């Protein structure tokens, strides 16, 4: 199968561990991915992010793994990861230095690509720090794409230029398999919802073999690790994040410490219904049915007893294979609210004689055919998700 036929899935070290990585940690993560159902669910890439090398290249011009962190070298790490039925990923940067100040691949693309291939790398995350002001961003990403292909090894190219120069317009053309479309995610509600809001109108450029990457998941981090910031997310907020990543059809790269991940978050990221939506073969983006404001009480202002916080009501509809649909409602406001939506806005006018037969993904409850409108009550910072089929309206 060609690379990235469906959104890539895996685990990346950065969100939790940052520079605190070593061989023992990577082996433990590989063991857990293989033994706790992640591999079977589709999480196949184990990726080491920044801070794995020495601060300077060797005399032969090649990047050298830090012998204190990886005493047996990267080939041994790759071999162990492969022995668990997983694929091995590494990190480099299009600049002269990585984001953490280690050697970047600028002007070393072909030698670095061959080094990665010799070690058995299957996935390269390619960052954008310390890029020369005179450099051509598109040209350097194309150069690394060519360098990877010149090795003869199949290596998934994960381009990470933070959304610079509208990557959705050219990353497919230069051979990337996924492209970061925003700055770094942080472990809080505002960060991940801002990312989604910035990308909803751009997802039609994402699809088979070249996916919009909304960054690694923070689900289950609970404020621990390298990207913790502000208030710790609730279960409902983490569920909202994971559902959005699945619904948007973007790569699912876990970032939490799998050794201490709470059971409810493991179950969430292994939920077969959600993963089936993410991995749907047609790779269609969701259609934006509604994106505006919820109506919530405003007791502090007698002149305006109701508030309408902007960009807080979302209704999204995603077409799936076999004439199935995923219907998503979200309330991003700070108060419980009803999210209203007319079926006509989903392409189902009353005169059509067709209703939407709905089943709640979270509870399993079959709600039956819905027509005219459907207006669920949703808690603050939470969502509802339904799998639906079209049925004749016999009323």
Give, region by region, the residue ranges found by the protein language model.
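Conserved, mostly hydrophobic/aromatic
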Residues: 11, 46, 81, 157, ...
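C-terminal beta-strand-rich structural cap/linker in extracellular carbohydrate-active enzymes
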Residues: 369-395
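Glycan-recognition surfaces
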Residues: 108-111, 139, 149, 154-257
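Solvent-exposed beta-hairpin/edge-strand motifs
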Residues: 345-363
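Catalytic cores of secreted or luminal carbohydrate-active enzymes
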Residues: 240-306
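Hydrophobic faces of well-ordered beta-strands that scaffold small-molecule active sites
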Residues: 7-12, 44-48, 88-90, 124-126, ...
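Carbohydrate-binding surface patches
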Residues: 245-248, 253-255, 305-350
């Amino acid at each position: 199968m060609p690379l990235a036929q469906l959104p890539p899935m895996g685990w990346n070290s950065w969100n939790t561990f940052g520079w605190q990585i070593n061989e023992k940690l990577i082996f433990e993560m590989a063991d857990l991915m293989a033994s706790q159902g992640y591999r079977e669910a589709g999480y196949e890439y184990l990726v080491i992010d920044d801070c794995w090398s020495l601060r300077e290249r060797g005399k032969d011009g090649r990047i050298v793994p830090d012998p204190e962190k990886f005493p047996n070298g990267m080939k041994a790490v790759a071999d162990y990861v492969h022995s668990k039925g997983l694929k091995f990923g590494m990190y480099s940067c299009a600049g002269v230095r990585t984001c953490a100040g280690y050697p970047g691949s600028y002007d070393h693309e072909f030698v670095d690509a061959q080094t990665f291939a010799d070690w058995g790398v299957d996935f390269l995350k390619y960052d954008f720090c310390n890029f020369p002001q005179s450099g051509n961003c598109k040209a350097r990403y194309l150069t690394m794409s060519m360098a990877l292909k010149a090795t003869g090894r199949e290596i998934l190219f994960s381009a990470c230029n933070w959304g610079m120069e509208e990557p959705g317009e050219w990353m497919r053309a230069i051979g990337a398999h996924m492209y970061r479309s925003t700055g770094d995610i942080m472990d809080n509600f505002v960060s991940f919802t801002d990312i989604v809001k910035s990308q909803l109108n751009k997802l039609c450029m994402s699809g088979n073999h070249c996916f919009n990457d909304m960054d690694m998941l923070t689900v289950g981090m609970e404020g621990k690790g390298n990207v913790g910031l502000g208030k710790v997310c609730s279960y409902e907020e983490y569920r909202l994040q994971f559902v959005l990543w699945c619904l948007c059809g973007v790569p699912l790269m876990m970032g939490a410490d799998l050794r201490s991940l709470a059971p409810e978050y493991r179950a969430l990221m292994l939920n077969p219904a959600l993963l089936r939506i993410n991995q749907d073969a047609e790779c269609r983006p969701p259609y934006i049915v509604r994106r505006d404001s919820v109506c919530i009480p405003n007791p502090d202002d007698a002149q305006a007893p109701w508030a309408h916080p902007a960009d807080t009501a979302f209704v999204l509809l995603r077409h799936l294979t076999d004439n199935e649909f995923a219907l998503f409602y979200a309330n991003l406001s700070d108060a419980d609210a009803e999210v209203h939506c007319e079926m006509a806005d989903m392409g189902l006018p009353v005169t059509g004689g067709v209703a939407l037969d709905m089943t709640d993904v979270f509870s399993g409850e079959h709600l039956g055919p819905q027509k005219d409108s459907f207006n669920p009550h949703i808690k603050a910072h939470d969502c509802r998700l339904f799998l639906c089929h079209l049925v004749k309206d016999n009323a």
